[in-house]
Amino acid sequence: MLAFFDPEQFKHEPKFSLFSGVPKPNSEVSERAKVLRDALLQHGHELKIPKPHGIIPVEAVHHQDYLHFLKNIYRRWQEIPGASAEVIPNIHPNRTAGNIPESAVGQAGWYMADTACPISNETWNSALASANTAVGAAQAVLDGHNSAYALCRPPGHHAFADLAGGFCFLNNSAIAAQHLRLNFQKVVILDVDVHHGNGTQSIFYQRDDVLTVSLHADPVSFYPFFWGYSHE
C-alpha cells in the first residue's frame, strides 16, 4: 500500500493537558506516529514524504482568521510577561453572543475549545505538515491509485473550521475530502474512533456532497460530550 508521512510532524510535542481538573502529561506524543511509521515499514509498505501542496487546500476548509491565529499565537503568547511555555486557554466564551478579542489570552479562549491542545513554537508547522500529508494521499487517489494511507499527527477530526480541540488543529480528513471533491462529486468520510468526529461533522453538516459517518462511544459520558448523538 502506498503511504505518506512527513517527519516534520514529530516536532509537535505538547506537554500539558487537563483531565478532570488534574494537570497531566499530554498523551498526543510523537511516539504514536513512530509506532505506526515503523509498522508500515516493517510490513513492506511504500512510505513517501508528500510533496508540498501549499496552503490553498487548508484554506478551502478553515477560516482565514483561525489560520492566522494558529500561525502567530505562540509568538504573541511569549510576549506576555510570565506566560506559560505553551499556549493554554484559561477562558472559554459562549460564542453565540460574543466578539473575537484582540488580546492573545482572549483569542486563545476563542479559538481553542479545551486544554488538550496546547500550542508550542512547532505546532503550526507540524499541523500544516499533517494536513499536507492528508492532501498527498488524496492526490494519489486523484492520480489513479486505488488507495493511499496518510499517517497524520497532530490528528484532526475534533478541529472545526475555526476552532482547535481534542489534540486537533487542522482537520486532516476534511481537508483531504475537500481536495477529492476536485474530481469526485460525492465523498464519504468514515470516522472510526472512540471519540465522535465533531469537527468533521460540523464542517460538512450543511452540505450534501460530503457524507460524514462516525462510529464512537456514547457522548452522554464521553468526550466530546456535546456532539455525536443519534438525532444528529
Give the residues covered by each predicted segment.
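HDAC/HDAC-like amidohydrolase catalytic core signature
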Residues: 1-190, 195-232
